[in-house]
């Protein structure tokens, strides 16, 4: 599963400020493949969900195409044990999540995959994610012709 090798701080503070941008500014265009899965809502995707979606996409594509994961789970989520009294500090890091904003590309497919198989592979992968997503095609690619 995906997680950072080493972090400067084990735990992160919660974001208390207002969101400056409602939609993603970076990571909104396809960079590697001809087809992609773009987020339509804000949320967090953990490393297990990303891995499950990647496996589902790769199983369908077999060796016909290549898959790129465009988000990385680098934000630690902490949890205190059940039935613990108040105080005693913040809990231990449990898993890592990738914050996703509307417009972020989560997966890309290319490298010889045709549109029909890429669409079906990404459809299978999107069912593993907790966000609404849509299928996108790179403008000006051979897929649009």
UniProtKB/Swiss-Prot annotation:
Keywords noted in UniProt: Ribonucleoprotein, Ribosomal protein, RNA-binding, rRNA-binding, tRNA-binding
Domain of life from the UniProt record: Bacteria
GO CC terms, sorted: cytosolic large ribosomal subunit
UniProt record, GO biological process: translation
Matching InterPro entries: Ribosomal_uL16, Ribosomal_uL16_bact-type, Ribosomal_uL16_CS, Ribosomal_uL16_dom, Ribosomal_uL16_sf
Keyword Secreted: no
Quaternary structure (record): Part of the 50S ribosomal subunit.
Function: Binds 23S rRNA and is also seen to make contacts with the A and possibly P site tRNAs.
Family: Belongs to the universal ribosomal protein uL16 family.
Descriptive protein name: Large ribosomal subunit protein uL16
Organism expressing this protein natively: Salinibacter ruber (strain DSM 13855 / M31)
């Amino acid at each position: 599963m995906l997680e950072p090798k080493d972090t400067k701080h084990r735990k992160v503070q919660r974001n208390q400020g207002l969101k400056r941008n409602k939609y993603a500014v970076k990571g909104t265009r396809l960079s590697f493949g001809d087809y992609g899965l773009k987020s339509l809502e804000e949320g967090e995707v953990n490393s297990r969900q990303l891995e499950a979606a990647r496996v589902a996409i790769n199983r369908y594509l077999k060796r016909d195409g290549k898959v790129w994961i465009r988000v990385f789970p680098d934000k630690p989520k902490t949890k205190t044990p059940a039935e613990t009294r108040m105080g005693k500090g913040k809990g231990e890091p449990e898993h890592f999540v990738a914050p996703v904003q509307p417009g972020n590309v989560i997966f890309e497919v290319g490298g010889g995959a045709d549109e029909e198989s890429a669409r079906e592979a990404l459809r299978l992968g999107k069912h593993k994610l907790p966000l609404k997503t849509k299928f996108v095609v790179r403008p000006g690619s051979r897929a649009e012709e």
